[in-house]
Each structure stands twice: as structure tokens, then as C-alpha cells.
């Protein structure tokens, strides 16, 4: 399946100022993310930004880049603008790769893109949680699926709740219990991506602070690729940045 990767990138970050331009082994983080995405088999990889410094860094490293408006409320709105600007057809598949994922698995990008079909205009990914601390951590978003592998719900709460297992103990994952952690990687059919910014915000989205709940609220199915490999986390803190720098220094 042919697909386009668009990477939204902004300089605004409360914990890591200028994060997309952070040096990782001689290259800016946003360039490292683009290079990983290029290994996925994407037909094209484009950075979407509203900042001249990010634009210049991409040009310097020969990474395709597109300037966008500065008033987008989310990365999804930003990539929708770029998909329209470059003239992607309605049937094109667009993958949104976060700009702070320099170690993202290229095969995960491709696997998520392949889930897009005539009946399913959006897809994402997940993996099984193996640590009990993650089960109860509200910063770890969980997803439950139907028998077809489509999302029933995303939540910061512990879902599904193992009634009998947790009645005995909450110190270990009960036998036979395999909750899924959501991975923030999204693929879209472009026709739906262009409709997305017009969808009204849902009450559930506001309660959980999870943008993807807007899609389920409006009755749009989301397919979920379950990977057996826990992905390397993105760069959100100075400690994350140091860890990734050590990787690229090897």
C-alpha cells in the first residue's frame, strides 16, 4: 500500500524548549524522525511546521518540508492542511508520525498504514502492557478492541477492569489479563482527514483529554494494529533526551 508520512513539528514545548531542533548525533531531532519514517517504505515523508528555524533545518538536511499556518489547534489539523496543499487525492493514506519519536519503528508505521480500508478511514497502534504500574497510570492511555480489532474505547482509566483478579490483588497483572497501551501513531484516509477538523469536540474527549475519542463519538471506526514489540518512548523530558542522545552516540 502506498502512503505518505507527514510529521507535524512546533517549537513550543514547556519542558524541552526547541525540542525538534535538539541535536542527536549531529542532526536535529526532527531530521532523525524523518529518516526513520523514510525507512517505512512511505512514498514521501514531509515535515509540517509553522516555524522558520525548523523549515531551515529540514532544507539543510534535504528533508521535504511544508510551511503551515500558525493557528492550528492540533497536529492533526496541521497535517490536514499539508495534505491539501500538496494535492493528495481523497483515497490517499496519510500517516501522522509525532515529531518527538526519533526511535520509532519504521515497520510499525507501515503496519498501521495497511489497516486503512474502504470501511475504516482511520487506524492506530497498541501493545500489551507488561508492568502493573502502567495499568494504573493515567498517563498511560489504554484501548479496548472489538473482535474485528477496532477500537471500542480509549481511556486513561484501567480498562478493561479485571474484577476478580483485582479483588485478590492489585500488585501484579492477573493471569490471562492483557490490557493494551495505546501508541500515538495515526493513519488516515485523506478524505476523512480533511473532514476531521470540522468534527465537533465530544464530551468524552474533554473529560479524558484524548483527541481520538472525538472520532469514536462521531461513529467513525478506528482499526488498531497490535504490535508484539513495546515501542521506545518519545522524547518528553530532559531524561528522555539524554537517553536518546546516548543511542545516537553509539
Curated annotation (Swiss-Prot):
Catalytic activity: 3-deoxy-alpha-D-manno-oct-2-ulosonate + CTP = CMP-3-deoxy-beta-D-manno-octulosonate + diphosphate
Localization: Cytoplasm
Segments passing through the bilayer: none
Keyword Lyase included in the entry's annotation: no
CDD domains: CMP-KDO-Synthetase
Enzyme Commission identifier(s): 2.7.7.38
Alphabetized InterPro entries for the sequence: Cytidylyl_trans, KdsB, Nucleotide-diphossugar_trans
Primary localisation category: cytoplasm
Protein's GO biological process: CMP-keto-3-deoxy-D-manno-octulosonic acid biosynthetic process; lipopolysaccharide biosynthetic process
Superkingdom of this protein's organism: Bacteria
Cytoplasm keyword on record: yes
Annotated keywords: Cytoplasm, Lipopolysaccharide biosynthesis, Nucleotidyltransferase, Transferase
Family listed: Belongs to the KdsB family.
Designated name of the protein: 3-deoxy-manno-octulosonate cytidylyltransferase
Organism, scientific name: Janthinobacterium sp. (strain Marseille)
